[in-house]
């Protein structure tokens, strides 16, 4: 997933709806990132430019709404996505990747509840329990720290890119 995000970000595309339902693992272990209906594309002449083009909704579901409203799945939304900030960038996808990692490590989303308003407030202000301290699970500290870094409320405190997330994981498990 990190590699797919890294490629998308490198060509100026932000997914904006990273969640387990949009991740498919094929029969040979290949990982596919699905449902690009909320993706935002930056013009190719300047990937960091504020001038952006919306990709039309291809698969509108309950978690998605019209322009100017919340777009995405609340359990995996970044604080800046919840606040509908105009200058949202690829770091929002890094947050969502962290939420998916958190769920993979703990079996639970970072924030839960039955009231959407409460979940959104938690996304904005609450720090989830650290995965390595979650129940009796043995989660490697480096993976727990990386996940919590991705879930930082401040986008500047998250890993600098999806490639950095992949690099940290590869460095600690392939060497």
Residue ranges and their predicted role:
Residues 22, 65-67, 136:
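Short, flexible, glycine/charge-rich loop motifs used to bind or transfer phosphoryl groups or to couple energy/partner
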Residues 13-21, 25:
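Catalytic-loop of the protein kinase fold
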Residues 28-30, 34, 39-79, 114:
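Activation segment of protein kinases
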Residues 10-12, 27, 112:
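Short coil/turn segments at alpha/beta junctions that flank glycine-rich nucleotide-binding fingerprints
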Residues 1, 16, 77:
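Short hydrophobic/aromatic patches on the structural cores and recognition surfaces of FHA
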Residues 2-13:
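Protein kinase catalytic-loop region centered on the HRD/HxD motif
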Residues 5, 24, 34, 73-175:
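C-terminal lobe helix-coil module of Hanks-type protein kinase domains
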């Amino acid at each position: 997933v990190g590699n797919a995000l890294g490629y998308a970000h490198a060509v100026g595309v932000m997914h904006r709806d990273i969640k387990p339902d949009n991740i498919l693992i094929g029969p040979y272990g290949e990982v596919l990132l699905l449902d690009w209906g909320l993706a935002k594309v930056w013009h190719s002449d300047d990937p960091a430019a504020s001038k952006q083009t919306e990709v039309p909704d291809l698969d509108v579901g309950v978690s998605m709404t019209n322009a100017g409203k919340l777009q995405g799945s609340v359990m995996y939304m970044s604080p800046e996505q919840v606040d509908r900030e105009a200058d949202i960038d690829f770091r929002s996808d890094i947050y969502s990747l962290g939420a998916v990692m958190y769920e993979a490590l703990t079996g639970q989303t970072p924030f839960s509840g039955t009231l959407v308003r409460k979940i959104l407030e938690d996304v904005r202000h609450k720090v989830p329990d650290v995965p390595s301290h979650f129940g009796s699970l043995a989660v490697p500290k480096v993976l727990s720290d990386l996940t919590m870094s991705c879930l930082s409320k401040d986008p500047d405190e998250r890993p600098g890119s999806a490639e950095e997330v992949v690099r940290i994981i590869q460095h600690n498990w392939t060497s």
